[in-house]
Amino acid sequence: MVREKVKVSTRTLQWRCVESRRDSKRLYYGRFILSPLMKGQADTIGIAMRRALLGEIEGTCITRAKSENIPHDYSNIVGIQESVHEILMNLNEIVLRSNLYGARNAIICVQGPGYITARDIILPPSVEIIDNTQHIATLTESIDLCIGLKIERNRGYSLKILNTFEDRSYPIDAVFMPVQNANHSIHSYGNGNGKQEILFLEIWTNGSLTPKEALHEASRNLINLFIPFLHVEEETFYLENNQHHVTLPLFPFHNRLVNLRKKKKELAFQYIFIDQLELPPRIYNCLKKSNIHTLLDLLNNSQEDLIKIEHFHIEDVKKILDILEKKIEKAFQKKID
């Protein structure tokens, strides 16, 4: 455990870790301070940081299990001490660390009798287990057990949908939250107009990230959220129908759209559906699942918004931009002709 005496700067805004400890493989704690802050600033930063820590940081979880030996998720299997439901719950508790994009597969293949732990999971190279001792199941007889696993990286919660799967695979409730808890408190000092504040941040993580890493990632996410506001005046325009506002924060062909707009005063983006854009099936399905149905819906999303869509990549955004540039140019040309 590392603990420091709190020394506060009275001039330059600084942050520092004043306490750091590892309670177990799956529980880290960190305490940080930021000072000096003007009255009210500590609460503003503390609330935003806590929400970013709990809701904006991505984690890696097992989201699905598949085995030919499992008839349904509340069954019992001869030779296994735990019920299928208990095994799924144990898999849900496995803490993973990764830099995944998209989904990956893993597998457990064990011959009994014996104990199955996280150490028995055969993982792809981009994924690591935080605690190899986490219990999964106990084989009481000489049986073979093979379980296929699906691993994903995401944020927030993913609740399983109750359904019967013909391929004998079962969804697992996933909590993609490396930060288990975060608190902030404020200490005020000084008098009158010179009153200042110190912000204290406490962070508990599951071991897949250290509190310091979580703090850095939450800070980057908050910064990225505010960046578009720095360019809002230059990168916003209004259509002439006075009903629809289109924002193109980072689209590289924005200036070209503005120039074309001078030649023709109205193009009904809200009546152009993404079905007409001839997008690749995977990109089309991702947009539909995100309630993006028209060109207007699409243009109201920044590149950052699109990248946040599940299973979306920067290459997909580039593909969309190429297609849109050609389609919109052709549409404007028809209007001009």
Swiss-Prot record:
Belongs to the RNA polymerase alpha chain family. One of its GO terms (biological process) is DNA-templated transcription. GO terms for cellular component: chloroplast; DNA-directed RNA polymerase complex; mitochondrion. Pfam families: RNA_pol_A_bac (PF01000), RNA_pol_A_CTD (PF03118), RNA_pol_L (PF01193). This is DNA-directed RNA polymerase subunit alpha. Signal peptide: none annotated. It comes from Arabis hirsuta (Hairy rock-cress). Residues 1-233 are annotated as: Alpha N-terminal domain (alpha-NTD). It is an enzyme of class 2 (transferase). The N-terminal domain is essential for RNAP assembly and basal transcription, whereas the C-terminal domain is involved in interaction with transcriptional regulators and with upstream promoter elements. SUPFAM superfamilies: C-terminal domain of RNA polymerase alpha subunit, Insert subdomain of RNA polymerase alpha subunit, RBP11-like subunits of RNA polymerase. InterPro entries: DNA-dir_RNA_pol_insert, DNA-dir_RNA_pol_RpoA/D/Rpb3, DNA-dir_RpoA, RBP11-like, RNAP_asu_C, RNApol_insert_sf. Keywords: Chloroplast, DNA-directed RNA polymerase, Nucleotidyltransferase, Plastid, Transcription, Transferase. It comes from the Eukaryota. Coiled coil: none annotated. NCBIfam families: rpoA (TIGR02027). Gene3D superfamilies: 5' to 3' exonuclease, C-terminal subdomain, DNA-directed RNA polymerase, insert domain, RNA polymerase, RBP11-like subunit. It catalyses: RNA(n) + a ribonucleoside 5'-triphosphate = RNA(n+1) + diphosphate. One of its GO terms (molecular function) is DNA binding. It is found in: Plastid, Chloroplast. Its EC number is 2.7.7.6. In plastids the minimal PEP RNA polymerase catalytic core is composed of four subunits: alpha, beta, beta', and beta''. When a (nuclear-encoded) sigma factor is associated with the core the holoenzyme is formed, which can initiate transcription. The gene is rpoA. DNA-dependent RNA polymerase catalyzes the transcription of DNA into RNA using the four ribonucleoside triphosphates as substrates.
